[in-house]
Amino acid sequence: MTAGHVDPTRIIERYYDQQPGREWERLERHRTEFAVTLGALGTYLPPPPARVLDCGGGPGRYAIELACRGYEVTLFDLSAANLRLAREKADEADVTLTAYEQGTATDLSRFADGAFDATLLMGPLYHLLEKGDRQQALAEARRVLKPGGPLFAAFISRYAVPRWAAANEPAWPLEHPEELEKILATGVLAPSGEEGSGFVAYFAHPAEVVPLCQRAGFEVAAVLGAEGLVSMLEAGVNALSGAAWDAWVDLNCRVAADPSILGCVEHLLAVAVKPRWRTVLAQIARQLNEAGVAYRVGGGAAIALHGVPIPVKDLDLVTDVAGAYHFQALFADHVVEPVALREDKVWRSHLGRFDFDGVTVEIIGDLHRRKGGEWVLATTVTETTVNLDGAPIRVPWLEEEALFYVWRGRLDRAAQCLHYCDRDRLLALWRQKQATGVCGQEEIPSF
């Protein structure tokens, strides 16, 4: 809630109910945005007849286009009038949408976990003024998305309003200085009047898009400037047809992912993926916890679970010898390389490799490192628990992982961690190294 007891959700519902054709006509006028977005959908969507949720899809401009291409599309929108218009437009196009559902993007409880192969969230994030609501909408989009499925999340850019004013109402900054300052400082265009009216919006800064999606558990593949190079300059281009129009579509699709243009467009499109590894790890953890197998998650997954935005290529689970063979017994159908004692010049462990829906999992029992002529147990000295989809996951402190990467010479990975580390914890572990020469997983260099 903002502006007293005014509910922005009801305001925006009225806004679209009053003119349900508004969004359909907007995309007719702004052909470049539509073309670039369709290009992204064509690149990242799984092939038809994949199940697609168009959440906040308005009168169904994208939903109907995807249905024409063979996708099974559920259209979900806040506005009943938008949904009625979508039915009419679908009939005109002679296509059938799977369902028409009315509701808010922060509550998709009518849909089961993993119900869709892809999710479009191209509208709701324009109007959710509170950060918690934007996070909730992304969390719900992730929940109903199948592991490995893409999300397409659209935002209005922080600078869309002043750019619009420059093109259409140059006196606007002088006439509305307080509104301009609030948008620049907070991104919020709040309800006006006691009952609220007009366009309620949140204008996202380009720099916040990726972290917001990552905190919701997505891995971001791209952020696109939907208008490409023609933001506020598109009238002439949009009047083109044939080869000339196709050439501009190709150019704008090619440059859309260039970070240098993201502050100079009206709409940003984040393309993200619900990583399979999170779902796989949660499933494994529940079974290991139930079986009483002690383990810790290490490597990139441990860092990502602490909130560091890095891609995870595989899962490393560290346990003892008995735990490694117990893991193999529990997941015998997933064995790629059976657990066995393996060693090289530096490391020795009871190592096995497994495959879960394309995610490689390594189980490491009693990891040792050669020190001099002896094998020394390499173990962590810290532990904390993080929650992953309701499953408690044991991981080392992020600070210990950061120091481990320093020791290994992976300064790039260590630097990614340091911004998220607790300074006092980091210093405490470093002082422990100074006193003992050992910090958790093994020695780290003195410098």
Task: Label every PLM stretch briefly.
Residues 2-48, 61, 65, 150-183:
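Conserved class I S-adenosyl-L-methionine
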